[in-house]
Curated annotation (Swiss-Prot):
Signal peptide: none
Membrane topology of this protein: Peripheral membrane protein
NCBIfam families in alphabetical order: PRK11263.1
PANTHER family, per the entry: CARDIOLIPIN SYNTHASE (PTHR21248), CARDIOLIPIN SYNTHASE B (PTHR21248:SF23)
InterPro entries in alphabetical order: Cardiolipin_synth_ClsB (IPR030872), PLD-like_dom (IPR025202), PLipase_D/transphosphatidylase (IPR001736)
UniProt-recorded name of the protein: Cardiolipin synthase B
Native species: Salmonella typhimurium (strain LT2 / SGSC1412 / ATCC 700720)
GO biological process, one term: cardiolipin biosynthetic process
Gene: clsB
Keywords attached to this entry: Cell membrane, Lipid biosynthesis, Lipid metabolism, Membrane, Phospholipid biosynthesis, Phospholipid metabolism, Repeat, Transferase
CDD domains documented for this protein: PLDc_CLS_1, PLDc_ybhO_like_2
PLD phosphodiesterase domain ranges (all copies): 108-135, 285-312
Documented EC number(s): 2.7.8.-
Native organism taxonomy: Bacteria, Pseudomonadati, Pseudomonadota, Gammaproteobacteria, Enterobacterales
Pfam families assigned to the protein according to its UniProt record, in alphabetical order: PLDc_2 (PF13091)
Catalytic site positions: H113, K115, D120, H290, K292, D297
Length: 413
C-alpha cells in the first residue's frame, strides 16, 4: 500500500488530552459502524476509564470496535477492565506481548508506537497522545505537552485502508525490493491537503525520515521542529545545519525537563554541532515535552507519533500525517512560538559543553553507540511479532433442576 496526497480535508490541531480526549470520546459516541483504535499506552486511570465507558457504550449499541495496544506500553490492565469490553464484543489485541523476566518487561524493541483512531470512514485521529491522565494539564508538573490532529475528508480512507490491511491475516506479502520509497511529491500544492505516512520494519522503514529530509531541503524561510526524543542520524542533522547556513531560520524545541534523564544527555551531545551551525535550540522548561510536530515556511506541517531518535526512526511502528495547509500551519506556528516565548530557554554559548578532548571523546562514543544501537539490536535473536487477541471471559454454566453433578450421580433432594 502506498498513499498519495489527498485534497479537501478538514484538519484540526488538538493540544494535550484536554482537547484530544473530548474530541475522541465525542467521535466514538457518534460512531455507527466501526471503531479502530490503536495506542502505545492505555492506563486504567481516570482517562482510561472514560475511554472504556465510551467503547463499551458503542459496542452495546452494535458498533464493531477493535482495539490494539502495545504489549510493552500497556502491560497492566486488569482482567475485569478488558473482560467487560470483550464480553460486549470489542475485539481486544496486544501487539507482541512477552512474559516478564524477574518482574521486568523484556520486549522493549520494535514496539507498536502509533496512536490512531478511525471512526467509520468519516473521522480519524493521528498524533502522539496516549490514553493516560498524565496528558491532562491538571496532572501537575509532570503533565506532558503533546499534539494530535482530528481529520475528516478523503485522507481518512487511506488511514482506514492502512488499518484494515494491517489486521491479523491481512498483512501484505513482504517485498524486500520495495523497501526504499521516495518521499511522495505534492505536485499540485494547495490547501487542505494531507498525506498519511508510516514507518514499519518491512517496506516503509524510513518513509517518515525522508519527508523530514525533503522538508529541510525545500525550506526557504523557516523551520520549527518540536520533538520529545531528539537524536536523529547524521543525514537529518546535516540537513538542519545546511538549511540554517543558507539563511533559513531553523528552530528546534527539545525537552528541558525530560521524563528520562538520558534524553537530555543525548540531545545535549548535539548542541555544539547544531548551534555552531546556526540552528536555534530551545529547551522547553515548563513540563515534559512529548510532542512530535514540525512545520516549514507557511504551508507544510506534520503531526504524529514518530520521535527523531533511533527507536522511532529505525525500530518502532510509527504514523504521521503530513499537512499542506496555510491555516493549519499558522495555528501550529502560533502555538510553538508561544511555547518558545513563554516556556523555553534558548541554548547559548554558555550552555554548550566545553570543547575538551575528553568531552569530544565522550560525545563521539555516545553518538555512534546510540546511532548504531538499532543495528546492534538486529544482532539479537529475531522473532516475528504477533498479535494476541484477548478472548471474552468464559460464561459460567447455568444451574438447572435437570443438571446432574458428575461427582454425585444420586438423586438431588
Amino acid at each position: 500500500m502506498k498513499c498519495g496526497w489527498r485534497e479537501g480535508n478538514q484538519i484540526q490541531l488538538l493540544e494535550n488530552g484536554d482537547q484530544f480526549y473530548p474530541a475522541v470520546f465525542e467521535a466514538i459516541a457518534q460512531a455507527q459502524q466501526k471503531i479502530i483504535l490503536e495506542t502505545f499506552i492505555l492506563f486504567e486511570d481516570e482517562v482510561g476509564k472514560k475511554l472504556h465507558t465510551a467503547l463499551l457504550k458503542a459496542a452495546q449499541r452494535g458498533v464493531k470496535a477493535e482495539v490494539l495496544l502495545d504489549g510493552y506500553g500497556s502491560p497492566d490492565l486488569s482482567d475485569a477492565f478488558v473482560g467487560e469490553l470483550t464480553s460486549a464484543g470489542v475485539i481486544f489485541r496486544y501487539y507482541d506481548p512477552r512474559p516478564r523476566l524477574l518482574g521486568l518487561r523484556t520486549n522493549i524493541f520494535r514496539r507498536m508506537h502509533r496512536k490512531i483512531v478511525v471512526i467509520d470512514d468519516r473521522i480519524a485521529f493521528v498524533g502522539g497522545i496516549n490514553y493516560s491522565a498524565e496528558h491532562m494539564s491538571d496532572y501537575g508538573p509532570q503533565a506532558k505537552q503533546d499534539y494530535a490532529v482530528r481529520v475528516e475528508g478523503p485522507v481518512v480512507a487511506d488511514i482506514l485502508q492502512f488499518e484494515v490491511e494491517n489486521l491479523p491475516g491481512q498483512s501484505p506479502a513482504r517485498r524486500w525490493w520495495k523497501r526504499h520509497h521516495q518521499a511522495e511529491e505534492n505536485r499540485h500544492p494547495g490547501e487542505a491537503q494531507a498525506l498519511f505516512v508510516w514507518r514499519d520494519n518491512e517496506e516503509h522503514r524510513d518513509d517518515i525520515e525522508r519527508h523530514y529530509l525533503k522538508m529541510l531541503t525545500q525550506a526557504k524561510r523557516e523551520v520549527i521542529i518540536a520533538n520529545a526524543y531528539f537524536f536523529p542520524g547524521y543525514r537529518l542533522l546535516h540537513a538542519m545545519r545546511k538549511a540554517a547556513r543558507r539563511g533559513v531560520s531553523v528552530k528546534l524545541i527539545v525537552q528541558g525537563e525530560p521524563d528520562m534523564p538520558i534524553v537530555k544527555v543525548g540531545a545535549r551531545l548535539l548542541y555544539n554541532y547544531l548551534v555552531k551551525g546556526g540552528v536555534q535550540v530551545y529547551e522547553y522548561r515548563r513540563r515534559p515535552l512529548h510532542g512530535k510536530v514540525a512545520l516549514m515556511d507557511d504551508h507544510w506541517a506534520t503531526v504524529g507519533s514518530s520521535n527523531l531518535d533511533p527507536l522511532s526512526l529505525s525500530l518502532n511502528l510509527e504514523a504521521n500525517l503530513i499537512i499542506h495547509d496555510r491555516t493549519f500551519n499558522q495555528t501550529l506556528r502560533d502555538n510553538l512560538q508561544g511555547i518558545i516565548v513563554n516556556d523555553c530557554k534558548q541554548v547559548d554559548e554558555s550552555m554548550l559543553p566545553k570543547r575538551t578532548w575528553w568531552n569530544l571523546t565522550k560525545s563521539v562514543l555516545a553518538f555512534h553507540f546510540l546511532r548504531h544501537f538499532p543495528a546492534l539490536v538486529g544482532w539479537l535473536p529475531a522473532h516475528t511479532p504477533h498479535l494476541a487477541q484477548v478472548p471474552p471471559p468464559a460464561q459460567p454454566e447455568m444451574e438447572t433442576q435437570d443438571r446432574v453433578d458428575p461427582e454425585n450421580t444420586g438423586v438431588k433432594p
